[in-house]
Regions:
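Short hydrophobic beta-strand element within catalytic cores of glycosyltransferases
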Residues: 65, 69-72
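A charged, aromatic-enriched C-terminal amphipathic alpha-helix characteristic of glycosyltransferases
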Residues: 107-136
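Aromatic "clamp/platform" in nucleotide-sugar-dependent glycosyltransferases that forms part
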Residues: 52
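Short alpha-helical donor nucleotide-sugar binding micro-motif in glycosyltransferases
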Residues: 30, 38-44
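Nucleotide-activated donor-binding/catalytic signature segment of Leloir-type glycosyltransferases, i.e.
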Residues: 12-31
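A short hydrophobic beta-strand element within the catalytic core of glycosyltransferases
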Residues: 47-48
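Short alpha-helical segment that forms part of, or immediately flanks, the ligand-binding pocket
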Residues: 38, 57-65, 79
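Conserved acidic donor-binding segment of nucleotide-sugar-dependent glycosyltransferases
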Residues: 85-94, 101-107
Length: 136
């Protein structure tokens, strides 16, 4: 599934034209309802974040909170910050394939490791973000 709001519908149409009529790939769009978002994470095995730039994407913490491995590319490797379950790939098919196979072959072990991460409590997260912003 490709979740999120596309910057333009033409981008989504272009992607569909490349992959064809593959019923394994869905485009649910932006999901704002909490229950549907949790269901989306739980119905997938991995989060792939293809961004070239990111600040601190909540999607990574959300996926890890559901014990889903996250595959990112080296452009945004600064977001790891010691968390378990985030894997970094170069932007080439060999690196991506190798890391994907590792995740598939070690999935249960990776989920156990992700469970060792310390996640901020939701009620404290906005206070923590506010504290960080006010220090700058």
């Amino acid at each position: 599934s490709i979740i999120g709001k596309a910057k333009s519908s033409s981008l989504q149409e272009k992607f569909k034209s490349i992959i064809g009529d593959d019923h394994n790939i869905r485009f649910p769009g932006y999901i704002s309802e909490r229950k549907k978002l949790i269901d989306a994470y739980d119905s997938h095995n991995i989060l792939i974040l293809p961004s070239y730039t990111e600040g601190q994407p909540y999607v990574v913490d959300e996926a890890l909170a559901r014990r889903r491995p996250v595959l990112i590319f080296e452009d945004i490797s600064h977001i790891i910050k010691g968390r378990k379950g985030i894997f970094v790939s170069k932007r080439d098919i060999n690196s991506f394939s190798e890391i994907s196979k590792y995740i598939i072959n070690n999935y249960k072990k990776i989920q156990e490791e992700i469970g060792k991460n310390k996640f901020p409590l939701e009620k404290n997260m906005f206070k923590q973000i506010s504290d960080i912003i006010s220090k700058n």
